[in-house]
Amino acid sequence: MNFISSHPAFNDTIDSLKNEFKDDKSNNVIICGAHDFSRTQSIDLYKKKYDKVIVFNQEPLTATQRQFMHKGYFDWLKQADEVWDYDKQNIEVLKLIRPDVKLHILKPYKDWSKYSPVEKDIDILFYGALNEHRRAVLEELKKKYKVVILNSWDGNVIDNHIMRSKILLNIHYYYESSMQEQARMIRWIGSPCRIISEKSWKNYLGVEEKEYSELLNV
């Protein structure tokens, strides 16, 4: 199995998939971020190179986030050998294009036991793109806790900060759809930290969740 992504935001997804399919010696490929590639490339480039092309969508496709659904992406979704998604809300949208779309939940992959304990000098760690919704929570939390907002795609830097943190906090970017950010939190599973997420419409990973108003008192 081969793996391709369009952005470092998919790094943890790719690592999870590599672990899951480590014994798969096929010439198939799983593509994350096809909505990006499809703006400038034809899927034919990949279909010629690989035996099977699997498009793994992870972008929210509810009514308020249709910017990801453009003609090029429609073509990719129609022509891919398989289409996967990790959220049932997206599945219902994708069924309009691909009735055979498959639900694929990410699986924990990281062995945190190999890391030596360090001093927990960070109360709350957050990383991810910022918007008004996320800033509002983080600014309030800063009044009571030592909050670190990390801006890095370097896995070693991220792991170092995770080990130093008491709480790993996930806040929805697209809070209207409240889809669980598996692509971020899958790295956290098994870490020596308390994981807290803003409440999702469905808790696939079984993490601790709180309503928006409750996040201010973690």
Regions found by a protein language model. Give the residues of each.
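Nucleotide-sugar donor-binding catalytic core of glycosyltransferases
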Residues: 1-26, 31-48, 54-214
